[in-house]
Design a protein with these regions (language model features):
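Low-complexity "stalk/linker" and mucin-like segments enriched in Ser/Thr/Pro/Ala/Gly
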Residues: 41-52, 151-172
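Low-complexity, Pro/Ser/Thr- and charge-rich linker/hinge segments at domain boundaries
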Residues: 10-17, 84-112
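Single conserved hydrophobic/aromatic residue that forms the stacking wall/gate
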Residues: 1-9
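Extracellular/luminal low-complexity segments enriched in Ser/Thr/Pro
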Residues: 53-61, 170-175
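Structural beta-strand segments of beta-rich domains
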Residues: 20-24
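Short, aromatic- and glycine-rich surface loops/edge beta-strands on solvent-exposed regions
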Residues: 3, 62-75, 81, 178-191
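Edge beta-strands of extracellular beta-sandwich domains
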Residues: 75-90, 194-204
Length: 207
């Protein structure tokens, strides 16, 4: 029988992330999905069916994942090839202030004014990878807000979770239009279980 053309397509790009459930689409033209089999053959994680696709869950950063695809064609199992994917750690997320405007969820990313009313009604911050390719939420473990008094002295306030503390909210109330503060030293953990200190500082400009 003529060898079928094979296809193994990462749903986002040719990279898998360690400790994370990466969706993968695998298909062989002319062969029903139920007759296509795939497995990781070099021991770096697991590959399981999920709906019409697969979920790859690598374990080791820097060690490639090799996926072997076979298909049942004419009652015989044929190899469709091995596919190699690089394995990386999930990138750092960015901190946002998440709010709803006219029923539409929005994320404040800094660099423009934010209504003081929205700020006062927002419980805290979120952290996520939101770059058009990935949309992955992280759990915020803590962060710091930094205000500056009239003498230019930094006044830090620390939160031990994702929510603004009472002291932070009190500082918000005192801010006049055009004043700024900074959200920094955000600690977050992703679905890979890796805790990280984010290098990004979010500048908030109060309208």
């Amino acid at each position: 029988a003529r060898r079928q053309r094979q296809m193994c397509i990462r749903d986002r790009m040719n990279v898998l992330y360690a400790g994370y459930d990466n969706p993968i689409s695998i298909s062989v033209p002319g062969v029903l999905g139920g007759q296509v089999q795939a497995s990781i053959v070099n021991g770096n994680g697991t590959l399981n069916r999920a709906g019409n696709g697969y979920i790859a869950h690598p374990t080791t950063i820097g060690k490639d994942v090799v996926i072997r695809v076979t298909a049942s064609v004419g009652g015989r199992t044929q190899s469709m090839g091995d596919y190699t994917y690089r394995v990386r750690q999930l990138p750092d997320p960015s901190p946002f202030i998440e709010y709803t405007e006219d029923g539409t969820p929005k994320r404040y990313r800094g660099g423009r004014g934010l209504s003081k009313a929205i700020l006062m009604n927002t419980p805290g911050i979120v952290a996520a990878i939101d770059d058009g390719l990935l949309n992955i939420n992280f759990r915020v473990l803590g962060f710091e807000t930094v205000f500056f008094d009239n003498m230019g002295n930094a006044v830090p306030e620390v939160s031990s979770g994702a929510s603004f503390s009472t002291r932070q909210k009190d500082m918000f109330r005192r801010l006049s239009r055009g004043k700024r503060f900074y959200i920094s030293r955000v600690r977050a953990v992703g679905p890979d279980g890796v805790e990280r200190l984010l290098p990004t500082t979010l500048e908030v400009i109060v309208n």
